[in-house]
Amino acid sequence: MAISQARKNEIINEYARHEGDTGSAEVQIAVLTAEINSLNEHLSVHKKDHHSYVGQMKKIGHRRNLLRYLRDNDIQRYRELIKSLGLRR
């Protein structure tokens, strides 16, 4: 369900805007996307795990808010991020 710390560090290093960047919108969105994808795999096997489903919905809402913030403040970074993460079709 949860992503490993090593995987999380890989994502942070890939999407960080500068050295030591762990809190930018891009990094937060990328980490949330990995966690959501992990929960999708878990929920496809454990369909009755409602607690994890609620947690997934909260993560999706948080990611949606961060994406809206990024879109409103820097459309170019938003477009690059959704393209690299494959969020929109």
Curated annotation (Swiss-Prot):
Cysteine disulfide links: none
InterPro entries (UniProt xref): Ribosomal_uS15 (IPR000589), Ribosomal_uS15_bac-type (IPR005290), uS15_NS1_RNA-bd_sf (IPR009068)
SMART domains found in the cross-reference section: Ribosomal_S15
Signal peptide span: none
GO CC, any one term: cytosolic small ribosomal subunit
The family this protein is said to belong to: Belongs to the universal ribosomal protein uS15 family.
Any one of the GO BP annotations: translation
Biological role: One of the primary rRNA binding proteins, it binds directly to 16S rRNA where it helps nucleate assembly of the platform of the 30S subunit by binding and bridging several RNA helices of the 16S rRNA. Forms an intersubunit bridge (bridge B4) with the 23S rRNA of the 50S subunit in the ribosome.
Record protein name field: Small ribosomal subunit protein uS15
Organism: Latilactobacillus sakei subsp. sakei (strain 23K)
Keyword tags: Ribonucleoprotein, Ribosomal protein, RNA-binding, rRNA-binding
Subunit architecture: Part of the 30S ribosomal subunit. Forms a bridge to the 50S subunit in the 70S ribosome, contacting the 23S rRNA.
MF annotations from Gene Ontology: rRNA binding; structural constituent of ribosome
Coiled coil: none
Record has Secreted as a keyword: no
